[in-house]
Amino acid sequence: MLGLGTLARKIFGTPNDRKVKSVRSLVARINDLEPEFQALSDEGIKQKTAEFQRRVQEGGESLDDLLPEAFANCREGARRALGLRAFDVQLMGGIFLHQGNIAEMKTGEGKTLVATFPAYLNALAGKGVHVVTVNDYLAKRDAEWMGKVYAQLGLATGVVYPFQSDEEKKAAYAADITYATNNELGFDYLRDNMKASKEEMRQRGHFFAIVDEVDSILIDEARTPLIISGPSQDRSDLYTKVDKLIPELVEEHYKLDEKTRNVTFTEEGNEFLEKRLLETGLLPEGQSLYDPESTTIVHHVNQGLRAHKLFNRDQQYIVRDDEIMLIDEFTGRMMRGRRLSDGLHQAIEAKEGVSIQPENVTLASVTFQNYFRLYEKLGGMTGTAATEAEEFMEIYGLGVVEVPTNRPVARADEHDAVYRTAREKHDGIVASIKDAHERGQPILVGTTSIDKSEALSDLLKAAGIPHNVLNARQHEQEAQIVADAGKLGAVTIATNMAGRGTDIQLGGNVEMKVMQALAADPTAHPDEVRARIEAEHAEEKERVKEAGGLFVLGTERHESRRIDNQLRGRSGRQGDPGRSAFFLSLEDDLMRIFGSDRLDKVLSTLGMKEGEAIVHPWVNKSLEKAQAKVEARNFDIRKQLLKFDDVMNDQRKAIFSQRLEIMETEDLSEIAQDMRYQVIDDLIDQHMPPRSYADQWDIEGMHRAVQDKLGLDAPLAKWAQEEGVDLDVVRERLCEASDRQMTEKAEAFGPETMRSIEKQILLQTIDAKWREHLLTLEHLRSVVGFRGYAQRDPLSEYKTEAFALFESMLNSLRQDVTQKLAQVRPLSEEEQQAMMRQFLDQQRAAAAAEAPVAPAPQPAAAAPQPTPELVGAEAGEPDPAAWGNVARNDPCPCGSGLKYKHCHGRLD
């Protein structure tokens, strides 16, 4: 008998069915327009794009109204550029992306082509579209591949990757459609907000982003902040000394919680630690672990414990070229250039005996959660999102729509086979692989870590089964290994296949085979080579299909069902046959930590012998519940982290917005004046309380403060003795005196130079104060959790204190800017000559060494107008007539180190 919910779904359809049905009429309109666009010439297609741009940018037509025509034009452009005609389901995926949804599309359904439709449509608005991928290889590949479609349509494509120059990045972001990784986009956003002028910024806004492998970027990596950091003091000796203590610990000294991936010292551990730290001299005599002065050493010891107990070689990291390389637990890729913060990376370096790099101090940071919420509109694609639909909606406001496949999925998903021990499981895996291999069926074996993939590889070698291994160590051969994984009888062992970005095609990858054949024989005719290889491939593909298609064998369940589904999804692409199965044991991490007791009872009930596997729906249900429990816990952690990060994010947006306003404003004298007046108000409040008499004022303290902050020698004692002088009079006189001082400075420097000095001081001070504030917030965040023991809500406490700290930072910012502007002065003639001599000495030294040298450091005081002549016998008399055309913002050819417009190009 059907349940009420099932009956209702049969009658009314699921919410997903209704969403799919709602766009069918749009797809029909696009199909109706197809003959009209097929009749256009190549130039006609480009002209259509120009017409669409006018209608949107000048005529005010909405992108929704334009969608059918734009999609029809894009479909025809792709057909001509790539020979690919988009299926109806691909058009549906494109519509859902444009509407700001996540389109769940199975592997092999052509997500890369799908992205071109919403990217093209939204690029017509002229604000730029970002297509986001998980690695640089995919960004470059997709930009080159789909760039042919955009070129056919008359649009420009850019690609952003590390180590490009500012000019290259700016050009890439200025393109209609820009391909980039999530990391590079986030880092460029942070770098832009550290620039000295708006002209130097690379990104031009955040209009629309299409995120490929959206679950990997917005969920798996959501907890990892992007951090731009600078070096701080070197403490490598301390890390080495602390590391020698950790192996002395026994189990009673610490408590390891594998569920939460946390480790803490017990009371016995603290006592042992204090004793050993005193003996080694790391803790001064008479000092306790609980003293405030011990905070630093306690932090280092805690990080050393985490490095030893939570981070394992070949699981969380590998050692290569005297470096610790982190491994992405979800994709198995090496994360080059990524380091753990708070001294944890240094603790791992000490543990492994590699060179210890200096700790870094945070200059700027942002999480992916908050970066991607900057976009006006966001869309995403993945093969697996339904299990995290609630999180996508709650955090990003993104709905998940399952797009129908072009052909029905023909993959057979078998129930899990559960063994009692890992040894029995491995025997079962090897036997299953051997059987499939002998039948010619290609096999993809999924493992969760490098050491497990290599252990399985050893077992297969012992059994005489040829195979390839794909993990972080074989990163360079990745494309070739994946391309061969669908060949007849191929056996491929891979750490997590999530986000690999390359389809496993039955019979192998035709394009890769063609490239290899042409590389081996450059004289061969490309068309003949392709025809021969396509014929061979078709024959091999049929034999692979007869053998059952790709067999995906999982050796362990992941904490997330989504990662398991991604592994399964590698098989059965585009209606191909396939099969998937997971081989598990009660000794697997997930089973041991989360589901072992319950499953043990189930297995005992079902009855089980040595070497025998239990395959039963009960087991699957039990496992799914364990995974759902872990997913719910991880979601709660991410939600809580986001609440804390939102506090910093609001402050970050305020600071970055203020910074941008300063860069865009030509004349900042009014902002500087407002700051100065506020500082005067603060000084009066501090030394001359409201409703007080003159004889109650702290005249001496006020005089020192006015000299320090405003650079004024004001006769405060004399003013205090005058009849009728009150706080308002003192304030007015100080404001007038400070205004006169700044007017005189502006006259001495010249208005343009003074404006430049104000801008430079404001930006430098904001950056310095923001860096200090980030460090303070990090420290607050690390201790605020303890407030829970006092029955106080840590989040509320964090919000209150973070706001107070932000206000304090703004007050300090005003004081520093005012003080620096008061102290800046024109250089004397002697100082100018000394600066020029120093500059020329460095220039000569650089020429002698035949190597570039950094410009001479500029003194704290700024050079005035007019600019002095060069002095000294070697200087010679500059001849401006010989310089040709010099841009006004370029360095002056005379070698003064100043801009041409402030030197020989000055307009008198």
From Swiss-Prot:
The gene is secA. This is Protein translocase subunit SecA. SUPFAM superfamilies: Helical scaffold and wing domains of SecA, P-loop containing nucleoside triphosphate hydrolases, Pre-protein crosslinking domain of SecA. It comes from Cereibacter sphaeroides (strain ATCC 17029 / ATH 2.4.9). InterPro entries: Helicase_ATP-bd (IPR014001), Helicase_C-like (IPR001650), P-loop_NTPase (IPR027417), SEC_C_motif (IPR004027), SecA (IPR000185), SecA_CS (IPR020937), SecA_DEAD (IPR011115), SecA_motor_DEAD (IPR014018). Its EC number is 7.4.2.8. It comes from the Bacteria. It catalyses: ATP + H2O + cellular proteinSide 1 = ADP + phosphate + cellular proteinSide 2. May bind 1 zinc ion per subunit. ATP binds at Q90, G108, E109, G110, K111, T112, D503. Residues 846-884 are annotated as: Disordered. Residues 846-864 have a biased composition (Low complexity).
